[in-house]
C-alpha cells in the first residue's frame, strides 16, 4: 500500500513543486495532527490520512503559484486549509488564518506551535469584524461562502491591487453571473483528485 510520504512526493512532482525534506516532513506532521485532533474536534469529514494528502495538502498547494506575497489572509481557515500547507511552503510570506469557530482556531494555533511556523498568525474572529493593521496582498478562501458573500466580506481586507482567490469545485456559474466585477476562472488539476477543481481570481484595483 502506498505511504503518505510516497503520495506526497508524487503529488509535489506532478504540481511541479520542489520542497526540502524538512518542509515535506512538516506537511506530513500536519496530517498527523489533523488525524489526532479530528476525533475530538471534528475538523474534517476525511478520516484516512492517505486521502488527506490529496484532499487537504495537494489541494491546498495547487494554488501556490497564484498566491501573491508578502501578506496573505486565509478566511474561514477551518483546520488550517489552505493556509498551513502554503505557509510551510512559503516561509518568507506572512499568513493570517481566520475562523469564527473557536475549536478550530484552537487546533490551528496548536498546529502552528507544534510545526514551529513563525510566519503564521491565528485569529478567532468573524471576517467582517476584522480590522488588520496592514492590508493583505492576497485574501483566499476554501469552501467558505458563495462568491458574492466572499467579495462583500473581504474587500475591506485587500490592499490596492491585492487579489482575492476563491477555491471551488465545479465552476460556480450562477454565483459568477451575479458578480459585478471582473474575474478569472483558473482550472486546477490536483494529483489524486478526480473531481473538478477551480480557482476564481479577482483583483482589487485602486478604484474598487
Give residue ranges: language-model regions.
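Residue-level signal for inorganic ion chemistry
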Residues: 34, 86, 168, 202
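Short alpha-helix immediately C-terminal to the canonical SAM-binding loop
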Residues: 104-106, 147, 172
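Conserved SAM/SAH cofactor-binding pocket of Class I
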Residues: 58-141, 151
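Short loop/edge segments at beta-strand edges and connector loops
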Residues: 21, 123-125, 187
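Active-site capping/gating segments
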Residues: 96, 170-208
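Class I SAM-dependent transferase core
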Residues: 1-69, 73, 103-106, 110-120
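A short glycine-rich, Lys/Arg-flanked "PGG" loop and its adjoining helix->strand segment in the class I
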Residues: 151-161
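Conserved beta-strand signature within the Rossmann-like core of class I S-adenosyl-L-methionine
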Residues: 161-171
Amino acid at each position: 500500500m502506498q505511504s503518505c510520504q510516497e503520495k506526497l512526493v508524487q503529488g509535489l512532482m506532478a504540481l511541479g513543486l520542489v520542497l526540502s525534506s524538512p518542509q515535506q516532513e512538516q506537511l506530513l506532521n500536519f496530517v498527523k495532527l489533523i488525524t489526532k485532533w479530528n476525533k475530538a474536534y471534528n475538523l474534517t469529514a476525511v478520516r484516512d490520512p492517505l486521502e488527506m494528502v490529496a484532499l487537504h495538502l495537494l489541494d491546498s498547494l495547487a494554488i501556490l503559484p497564484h498566491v501573491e506575497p508578502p501578506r496573505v489572509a486565509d478566511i474561514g481557515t477551518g483546520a488550517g486549509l489552505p493556509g498551513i500547507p502554503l505557509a510551510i511552503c512559503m516561509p518568507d510570506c506572512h499568513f493570517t488564518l481566520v475562523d469564527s469557530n473557536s475549536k478550530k482556531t484552537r487546533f490551528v494555533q496548536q498546529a502552528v506551535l507544534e510545526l514551529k511556523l513563525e510566519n503564521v498568525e491565528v485569529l478567532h474572529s468573524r471576517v467582517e469584524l476584522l480590522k488588520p493593521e496592514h492590508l493583505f496582498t492576497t485574501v483566499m478562501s476554501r469552501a467558505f461562502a458563495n462568491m458574492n458573500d466572499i467579495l462583500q466580506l473581504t474587500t475591506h481586507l485587500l490592499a490596492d491591487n491585492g487579489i482575492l482567490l476563491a477555491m471551488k469545485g465545479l465552476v460556480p456559474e450562477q454565483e459568477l453571473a451575479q458578480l459585478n466585477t471582473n474575474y478569472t476562472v483558473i482550472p486546477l488539476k490536483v494529483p489524486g483528485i478526480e473531481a473538478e477543481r477551480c480557482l476564481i481570481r479577482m483583483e482589487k484595483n485602486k478604484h474598487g
